[in-house]
């Protein structure tokens, strides 16, 4: 078997641990520095094939040793060549469709240019793998349109639109993306945006105009780099009319932003009596509505859910938002909203800093 004799068991497990640690360092630190995209899996497979061939060619007990079976060796070499060609095609395809690729510790971000030859459809998208973090039309007459999960029919769009007539607003945004929500900013509004990934801030400012356009309209826009919860803990109460929590569309969900303690912090930064917390819960793997519903019950908040559809837009997307407000507030009286019941089905959906499990909310 693979397990070594007892005399060598310590060194065996030490080697396993060292290999795991080295792999983690290479994946999290070295690969982002050396590779512009997620190529390490493909390179690892190719390297494994080359290693296997090298061992088989040099092992006297192998059928490929010293050219004993040339047809089989040719087949292996052909397979390796085909793998190299497919890798080359993949690299070319991913790079040709991307305006820019930015990779760091947090992952790989790409800005894609789409339908550039059609002015009315021409738009840019910020993507990470299959997750879209926002889009913007490039035509000057269309670029203020809020699309994707943030359309006027979405939960957050309805809240921001309904409050526009009340005068200048204070809006907090956790999770920047392309800064699409800045499309709703008007003169006198104060928008404070929180983002942990410096690459997101850089790309949103350089390749999308939502932030610059909002400033030009007279809104005050300020970005804070770092973990949103830690930054908010250091700040004095912000008196937000709307605080959006939008960091859950990807595969890695920051659970510490959905705990009872986190929402206590959000409430401390919310304006009374009609401040709204808008939580974006669209996720193909997790039913996060149950988590937010349980937290709302714990803090004695009203909660409604708003679902919006793409409506045929080339940059549209299905979106689910849960809106929370203090009991008795009329701010959640939205015709398309579905009131969430006070009772929460199932167990284990109330997350705290000490106890939270993604398994309980898997779809």
Show where each model-derived region lies.
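Alpha-helical transmembrane segments of multi-pass membrane proteins
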Residues: 1-342, 346, 353, 357-363
């Amino acid at each position: 078997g693979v397990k070594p004799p007892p005399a060598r068991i310590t060194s065996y497990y030490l080697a396993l641990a060292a290999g795991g640690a080295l792999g983690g360092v290479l994946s999290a630190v070295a690969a982002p520095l050396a590779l512009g995209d997620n190529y390490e899996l493909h390179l690892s497979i190719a390297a494994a094939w080359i290693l296997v061939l090298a061992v088989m060619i040099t092992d006297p007990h192998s059928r490929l040793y010293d050219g004993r079976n040339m047809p089989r060796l040719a087949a292996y070499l052909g397979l390796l060549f085909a793998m190299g060609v497919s890798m080359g095609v993949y690299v070319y395809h991913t790079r040709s469709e991307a305006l820019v690729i930015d990779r760091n510790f947090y992952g790989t971000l790409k800005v894609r240019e789409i339908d550039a030859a059609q002015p009315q459809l021409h738009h840019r998208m910020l993507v990470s793998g299959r997750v879209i973090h926002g889009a913007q039309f490039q035509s000057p007459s269309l670029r203020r349109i809020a699309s994707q999960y943030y359309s006027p029919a979405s939960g957050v769009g309805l809240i921001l639109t309904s409050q526009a007539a009340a005068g200048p607003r204070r809006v907090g945004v956790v999770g920047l993306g392309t800064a699409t929500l800045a499309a709703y900013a008007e003169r006198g509004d104060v928008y404070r945006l929180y983002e942990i990934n410096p690459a997101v801030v850089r790309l949103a400012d350089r390749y999308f105009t939502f932030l610059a356009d909002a400033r030009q309209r007279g809104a005050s826009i300020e970005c804070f780099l770092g973990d949103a919860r830690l930054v908010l803990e250091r700040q004095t109460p912000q008196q937000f009319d709307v605080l959006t929590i939008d960091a859950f569309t990807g595969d890695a969900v920051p659970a510490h932003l959905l705990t009872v303690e986190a929402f206590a912090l959000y409430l401390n930064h919310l304006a009374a009596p009609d401040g709204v917390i808008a939580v974006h819960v669209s996720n193909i793997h997790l039913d996060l509505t149950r988590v937010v519903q349980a937290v709302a019950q714990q803090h004695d908040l009203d909660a409604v859910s708003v679902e919006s559809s793409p409506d045929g837009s080339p940059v549209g997307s299905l979106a689910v938002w849960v809106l929370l407000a203090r009991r008795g507030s009329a701010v959640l009286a939205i015709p398309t909203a579905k009131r969430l019941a006070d009772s929460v089905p199932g167990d284990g959906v109330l997350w705290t800093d000490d106890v939270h499990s993604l398994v309980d909310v898997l779809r």
